[in-house]
UniProtKB/Swiss-Prot annotation:
PANTHER family: ATP-DEPENDENT ZINC METALLOPROTEASE YME1L1, METALLOPROTEASE M41 FTSH. This is Uncharacterized protein OtCpg00170. Gene3D superfamilies: 1.10.8.60, P-loop containing nucleotide triphosphate hydrolases. GO terms for cellular component: chloroplast. It comes from Ostreococcus tauri.
Length: 1260
């Protein structure tokens, strides 16, 4: 087979599965007018040119142009909101088909030219390829914005839907948006100038690694010229090859320096064969290479537009200004721009190449496909290029009055009101009216870089964003601040009826011409909304197909939709389904790990991450139906306030965020305190009631937005990415509001919803141990944590380090490589083999290995220098027996978190059996005695329980019965017994044995639900990983009682515990969060079993405050105590807490009220911290000034405050603790000085007394 045919076959293989996916999966849910369009586009002949039987470009454009997806009999204005949404869904898939087909049709033109050139006898060498593709390269770079404008979006999207499993599409969402924005910027650079040192090479067979000096010089000469231009310090070359990253080395002839340039690949042909090509899915091995370098290259690509360079190009007249912004730009471009003189003049391929280019790249045809072909609207007065979102796009008729007002005086004769002229310039992701700009009015400052995806870690890569934008920051601030004073989010209509809209008909008429230009940048939302809309359409049809057509519940992917709309609303999993079986410990772990990547915390638990990362979900149908009901309940949160009739439920991404609403025109409390409205329905209702009862007080509240430094940051504010920076006069209602939403926020970190992404791995312990027998999911949980955190994962076996000669060297090399890729996760299996207790072994090699591990674990890994590294990594270790480990590994500061992965109990085994059987390819007999098999599998691990069903499936298929029976399950049970103990379970004599068991279960009404005997109030997930979400336990005191003394010594040396929180440099909102932590910390017991997690040094929320064991039993830590004590002093404390807030605005009444209620809050809380203290500890020595060895500090007001607390504690010394259901005797430390508490007897009681006392507090 020739090389050409092989390429064509590969292309065909890539494309056809998408058509099959649409036809098979969506079926009759998609209306199919002119369905032959897609069929023709996907023909093999089409990829080799229309001469081989495909449609001509004119026929294709006419067919697409005449297709009318909407009902022409109905006028757009007559459709209700529900009907509009229904039409969007009805034709969404057909729209996606056309867009993807158009994108691949255009890409095929480049391939066709290359194939034609190869057929003409051109030698397949690096020199020949470079010479013959140069015209295509330059043409591609010039026409990129219109010719391949959907390549970064639809091309990758289509590939994800075809080659990859469609369930993984959501993992590529971030990659798609970032890559799309980067490519658009490349297109703009090449469109404006020939000398910009950024080229797009679209040759499939072109070697990217010059192997000789001649090839290297040739590539430099053909692509960059004689030597690298000095206009750009960090040139990037896009190489349209596989989805991977490679490097190319180019030497500057002037300086003789060799530089590595990253190459970014996009085409799908070689993904499965190229080892460096990795999709955006967690692969756990080699992820560090892809994650770090690839995304950095994408980030670098997004900054290639230099404003000064563009200005110089225009000033020098390299390219005509009119041709850039004229709607007839494609018709004015001269084909001589391809510069064929660089081809070999001795060959006669030049003329034929010109003819091929003219034939395939007809500018009129390209423009037709770009503007008309993918426009889904039928009304001639409101079409626009790009995907049509119906009412969520810019209606030209609505803009005419606005434009007339701006331009009527002097520019009326230049206005051409044609729908095609008003189009989307995808090259920069901005909305611009090309027909309404003249040569003198174009301002290149409008080309502010548009970030495809904002990720904090990438900000300083290649360019300093502050200096990059500082040139126009002052002018933009002044201009845009004036704009914000005259309009609001509601007036812009960007969030009309809870749906992201771009209708501009409600714009304030007082806007100036410059402000209108700024307003056009809001069009940067369009690429994201389109990408979100495409995924959302597929998701909705997938959902409808599963639940209405096949009638078989299956796992549904819905989570990552909030990437596309780029809105801030993130629905926590515990808000959707209630209690998350992992408790707050896992929330904090996942939250901190994910913040290290700069992304928000969307779903802080394991379940749906396992779902998304292609691991076995094992979700039963009845549970999934229940989850769907809860999701719908959350989606209705804001929609029910804006529409009276809603037949369709919007996803979480479209929940409205009116962060900039005018307080005078918007009475909704959620618009001014949006950070409090991330709870569920009951929280919103309570806040609404509170607003009505405290309207006078709320009228004095004021929300001040921090002034933005750049125009695009303000645009992001309009998109819903605006964080709350300053809140004045808020403390007078803080405690009351916290009480109203306390129960709703009890299971989710408050700070996580307010300020995600601020703190990183330095707030975490260094490691966590996964303890349990093999087969209970230690590696499974490690993969789930890695997938949720989105961090590079390094997996290794501890046996690699047991080598006597190279073991220590390998260990040092491992930590060095991991820290070079920090932040990341290191997972070591059977870590107890390299952390043997040094007192129990005489082997010098094992002693040396354990010592070296501790040195590397603490960060002292660089040679012999005893200095710690600042690169943070999180170490996960799996161990079967923790008693074999060295006590030094379990002390505070190292492996502080321990997860015990126990064997499943009876209820879990029964549920796991039924769950696995329901997902097997065979049926289930209704007479199976599940209780019997659950009892007989006592002591089995989770893997062995699943193996019972697997063996039963094989038995059923072998007997050609295809049904699970009692006999087949019994065979599976026997196989496990035979393997473990070399014995079998006695078989039943006849069917009567199992029938009798089944009848007994029916009579006793035994339900197949999980039996949780630890805590009846807990409702964890019914899933395979429920046994993984066990509580974090403190193993160190249990196995090493002598560690308490050393731990106390460690705590004494922690100076951080002796200082109050310094909020002079922090935001006032964080003080609110900190107080909120104290308000809801007593709810921690609700999300964990009776044996709650106890850590040597734990952490609370994102503020990074050090807690301890006693605090988790109900105590505020030392820093919080000092902070709340400072609040009591209104003259010093408040100024200390935040020096940037003008506290003079708080009147005397508010200060007095805050002082009284803060003292009541603190004293009441502390009076119930301890149920019984030791006799020598009842005076709270080392804490309130009664220890003679403790030197008192602070004012007399502080001492009086301590005396009141001491008196309250004396009164409640022998009272039962009313807050927590605890049992057992627990020893621990408290604060930095260290003392012990002992709980003498079990404690019970709800959290009613404290809540009632707070609710009785009245504002004066």
């Amino acid at each position: 087979m020739t090389q050409e045919n092989n390429n064509s076959t590969n292309l065909k293989t890539v494309i056809i599965p998408f058509h099959e996916f649409i036809a098979n999966e969506l079926g009759n849910n998609c209306i199919k007018p002119n369905d032959e369009i897609l069929t023709v586009l996907l023909k093999r002949e089409e990829w080799e040119g229309h001469e081989d039987g495909g449609e001509t470009p004119t026929e294709l454009s006419d067919r697409v142009k005449n297709w009318q997806p909407y009902d022409a009999r109905k006028d757009r204005q007559q459709l209700t909101r529900v009907e509009q949404i229904q039409y969007q869904l009805k034709y969404g898939v057909k729209s996606l088909q056309l867009i993807l087909g158009q994108a691949f049709y255009r890409i095929s033109l480049v391939n066709a030219i290359m194939h034609r050139q190869y057929e003409q006898g051109v030698k397949v060498t690096s020199r020949g390829r470079a010479k013959n593709i140069l015209g295509v390269v330059k043409w591609n770079a010039t026409y990129w914005p219109q010719y391949l404008k959907y390549y970064g979006f639809s091309g990758i999207l289509n590939y994800c839907l075809t080659v990859l499993d469609y369930r993984r599409v959501f993992q590529l969402s971030v990659f798609t948006i970032a890559m799309g924005a980067g490519i658009m910027r490349f297109g703009l650079a090449q469109k404006l100038t020939k000398t910009q040192p950024t080229y797009v090479i679209s040759a499939e067979k072109f070697s990217v690694q010059p192997k000789s000096k001649s090839e290297q010089n040739l590539l430099m000469e053909k692509v960059f010229g004689k030597k690298l231009p000095k206009a750009l310090e960090n040139p990037i070359v896009l190489y349209v090859e596989p989805l991977g990253l490679t490097n190319i080395q180019l030497r500057d002839e002037g300086t003789k320096e060799i530089t590595n340039y990253p190459f970014i690949g996009l085409t799908p042909e070689t993904l499965t064969t190229h080892r460096s090509a990795r999709p955006m899915v967690p692969t756990y091995e080699g992820l560090e290479k892809f994650d770090a370098d690839y995304l950095k290259a994408i980030r670098a690509a997004s900054y290639l537009i230099d404003q000064e360079t563009l200005k110089n190009v225009i000033d020098t007249g390299t390219v005509s200004k009119n041709s850039i912004h004229s709607p007839n730009f494609f018709e004015k471009v001269d084909l001589n721009f391809f510069e064929y003189e660089e081809f070999d003049e001795k060959t006669d391929n030049n003329q034929s190449s010109v003819q091929e280019l003219s034939q395939f790249f007809n500018p009129k045809m390209i423009r037709t496909l770009s503007t008309e072909g993918i426009s889904l609207g039928t009304q001639p007065d409101w079409k626009m290029a790009g995907p049509k979102l119906q009412t969520n796009t810019l209606a030209v008729n609505d803009v005419y009055p606005l434009i007339d007002k701006y331009w009527s005086e002097s520019k009326a004769d230049q206005i051409h009101k044609t729908s095609a002229d008003f189009q989307l310039e995808n090259s920069v992701g901005k909305l611009t009216s090309a027909a309404y700009r003249t040569e003198s009015e174009f301002d290149f400052n409008d080309l502010e870089d548009f970030d495809g995806l904002e990720v904090d870690e990438w900000d300083d890569f290649y360019f300093d964003r502050k200096s990059f934008r500082a040139k126009t920051a002052e002018r933009e601030n002044e201009k845009f601040n004036e704009f914000l004073m005259q309009t609001s989010m509601d007036e812009l209509g960007l969030y009309k009826n809870g749906f992201p809209s771009l209708e501009l008909k409600r714009i304030n008429e007082n806007l100036t011409k410059e402000q209108f230009k700024d307003l056009e940048l809001i069009g940067g939302l369009l690429p994201s909304i389109f990408t979100w809309y495409a995924f959302y359409t597929l998701y909705q049809f997938r959902l409808n197909y599963i639940y209405n057509v096949r009638k078989k519940p299956e796992p549904i992917l819905y989570t990552r939709l909030d990437h596309f709309g780029r809105l801030q609303n993130k629905v926590k999993l515990n808000e959707v389904v209630g209690i998350d079986g992992g408790g707050e410990a896992f929330d904090k772990l996942f939250s901190a790990l994910q913040r290290a990547r700069g992304m928000g915390l969307y779903l802080p638990t394991v379940l749906l991450t396992i779902w998304e990362s292609s691991l076995s979900p094992l979700i039963p149908g009845e549970l999934d139906n229940w989850l769907l009901t809860q999701r719908n309940k959350v989606r209705m949160n804001f929609i029910k306030h804006t529409t009276s009739k809603v037949d369709f439920l919007m996803p979480e991404v479209t929940l409205a965020q009116k962060m900039l609403s005018d307080p005078d025109k918007t009475s909704g409390y959620e618009s001014r305190f949006h950070f409090l409205t991330h709870a569920v329905d009951s929280a919103i209702n309570k806040m609404d009631a509170f607003e009505k009862s405290n309207s006078k007080m709320l009228s004095n509240l004021e929300l001040t937005l921090q002034e933005s430094k750049t125009k695009m940051s303000k645009i992001r504010h309009l998109q819903g990415l605006l964080p709350i920076m300053k809140v004045k006069e808020l403390f007078k209602v803080t405690l009351k509001l916290l009480q109203l939403i306390e129960n709703e926020l009890s299971h989710s970190p408050v700070i996580s919803a307010l300020k995600p992404g601020r703190y990183g791995l330095n707030t975490l312990p260094k490691g966590m141990l996964l303890v349990g027998d093999p087969g209970n999911g230690r590696s499974f949980l490690a993969r789930a944590i890695a997938s949720e955190s989105r961090l590079p994962v390094f997996k290794t076996e501890s046996t690699r380090f047991l080598d006597v000669k190279f073991g220590v060297m390998r260990l040092m090399s491992l930590f060095r490589r991991v820290r070079d890729q920090a932040p990341g996760i290191l997972f070591i299996r059977d870590i107890d083999l390299i952390t043997i207790d040094r007192e129990r072994t005489n082997s010098p090699e094992l002693i040396q290995l354990t010592t070296q591990f501790l040195i590397c674990f603490d960060g002292y890994y660089i040679g012999s220098e005893a200095r710690p590294t600042q690169r943070k990594i999180f170490t996960l270790g799996s161990v079967s027996d923790i008693t074999r480990m060295d006590p030094a590994c379990l002390r505070s500061g190292r492996f502080e978190w321990v997860v015990n992965l126990r064997k499943p109990i009876l209820g879990e085994r029964k549920f796991l059996l039924l769950q696995k059987a329901s997902q097997s390819p065979v049926q289930i007999d209704a007479t199976i005695a599940w209780n019997y098999f659950g009892l007989m599998s006592e002591g089995f691990t989770n893997a062995e329980v699943v193996s019972i069903v697997n063996n039963s499936t094989l038995q059923a298929i072998r007997k050609n019965e295809f049904v699970h029976t009692n006999e087949s399950l019994n065979e599976g049970l026997n196989s496990i017994f035979q393997l473990r103990w070399n014995q079998t379970v006695s078989k039943a004599a006849d069917e009567g044995f199992f029938n009798e068991l089944h009848l007994s279960e029916v009579i006793n009404s035994n339900k197949l639900t999980v039996d949780y005997t630890m805590n009846e109030k807990e409702r964890p997930f019914k899933t395979k990983c429920m046994h993984l979400l066990t509580t974090v336990k403190n193993w160190s005191p249990k196995n090493n009682p002598t560690e308490i003394s050393s731990l106390r010594m460690q705590n004494i040396g922690m100076s951080i515990q002796t200082q109050p929180v310094d909020y002079s440099q922090e935001l006032i909102v964080e003080l609110l969060d900190f107080m909120a932590e104290g308000a809801f910390i007593r709810q921690l017991r609700r999300c964990s079993p009776a044996n709650t997690f106890v850590t040597q040094t734990s952490y609370s929320g994102q503020l990074g405050e050090r807690l301890n064991k006693t605090f988790l039993k109900g105590c505020l830590n030392y820093r919080m105590e000092n902070t709340l004590a400072l609040i009591e002093n209104p003259t010093q404390g408040l100024k200390t807490l935040s020096g940037t807030i003008s506290w003079e605005a708080l009147n005397k009444t508010a200060l007095k009220d805050l002082q009284q209620r803060t003292a009541l809050f603190t004293s009441w809380y502390k009076s119930r911290m301890f149920c019984q203290l030791k006799p020598d500890q009842r005076s709270l020595t080392n804490r309130y000034g009664y220890n003679p060895n403790y030197q008192q500090t602070g004012s007399s007001s502080m001492n009086r405050f301590k005396d009141r607390i001491k008196a309250r504690l004396r009164e409640s010394t022998h009272q039962a603790h009313p807050l927590y259901a605890m049992s057992g005797s627990i020893r621990g430390t408290f604060g930095s000085r260290g003392y012990e508490t002992r709980l003498q007897r079990p404690l019970t009681g709800p959290v009613t007394q404290m809540s009632q006392e707070f609710l009785n507090i009245q504002f004066k």
